[in-house]
Regions:
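Alpha-helical scaffolding within the catalytic cores
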Residues: 1-2, 34-37, 61-74, 98-109, ...
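Serine-esterase "nucleophile elbow" of acetyl-processing enzymes
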Residues: 1-54, 67-76
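Oxyanion-hole/transition-state-stabilizing segment in secreted/luminal serine hydrolases
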Residues: 13-15, 21, 61-98
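Solvent-exposed loop/turn segments at secondary-structure junctions
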Residues: 18-21, 56-61, 86-91, 117, ...
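Active-site segments of SGNH/GDSL-like serine hydrolases
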Residues: 83-87, 102-139
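A conserved mid-domain beta-alpha-beta active-site/ligand-binding segment of alpha/beta enzyme cores
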Residues: 161-163, 168-170, 178-188
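Glycan-recognition surfaces in beta-rich domains, encompassing non-catalytic CBMs
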Residues: 172, 176, 197-200
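Conserved catalytic region of serine esterases and O-acyltransferases that act on ester linkages
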Residues: 182-200
Length: 200
């Protein structure tokens, strides 16, 4: 964030599945990814920002690792948000281990990229079941000292407490409506604002 505060030119990138792509949002500017990008623009008016969205529906971290360069890293991002916690479907311990390995390969590729991007892990959740690969993904994130956001521990928990209904959030139990995109963006922005405050 120091570079943004100095007014430098930065690229904000996103890599994930259909939620990152913007599934069910009424317009691009209503997606969580674009809302997070707009936070950077509004928080650092002196800087110039570029937006790259590498979200493709139905893709897991294995495919994400294969397409990371062409869909995101070739643009030399300075900040990257990674979201594959619901696309990495670990139905068995063996599958969980497999996706943890592919996720580690993806995260390693991003953090070691020459542009040295700051990385943030976003963990979405199946609202109808609570399933997510966040525990496995967060273990990888902790290894690389990458901060993470848990939607299961925030929005999903509030839903279970009765503050939201399942019908208010994803119409199919997973993919976000406009409200959920806004809420997810809010959780990411909350962490970004905490990081910004630590640096001041």
């Amino acid at each position: 964030m120091a570079r943004a505060a100095r007014g430098e030119e930065l690229t904000i990138g996103f890599l994930g599945g259909s939620i990152t792509q913007g599934s069910l949002a009424s317009a691009e500017d209503k997606t969580y990814a674009y809302r997070v990008y707009r936070w950077w623009c509004d928080a650092f008016l002196q800087a110039e920002f570029h937006y790259v969205n590498g979200g493709i529906g139905g893709t897991c971290s294995c495919f994400g690792a294969a397409r990371a360069v062409g869909d995101l890293l070739m643009y030399q991002p300075d900040v990257v948000v990674v979201d594959f916690s619901v696309n990495d479907k670990g139905e068995t311990p063996e599958e969980e281990s497999f996706y943890q390995e592919t996720y580690e390969g993806l995260l390693r590729r991003i953090v070691s990229w020459p542009s040295s991007p700051a990385v943030l892990v976003l963990n979405n959740v199946y609202y109808d079941s609570g399933k997510t690969m966040q525990d496995r993904h967060n273990a990888v994130a902790e290894h690389y000292r990458v901060p993470f956001v848990s939607i299961k521990d925030s929005i999903y928990r509030k839903m279970k407490e009765g503050r939201y209904s399942l019908e208010e959030l994803p119409p199919d139990g997973l993919h976000p409506n406009a409200l959920r995109h806004e809420l997810v963006a809010g959780e990411v922005i909350r962490l970004l604002e905490e990081i910004r405050a630590w640096g001041e």
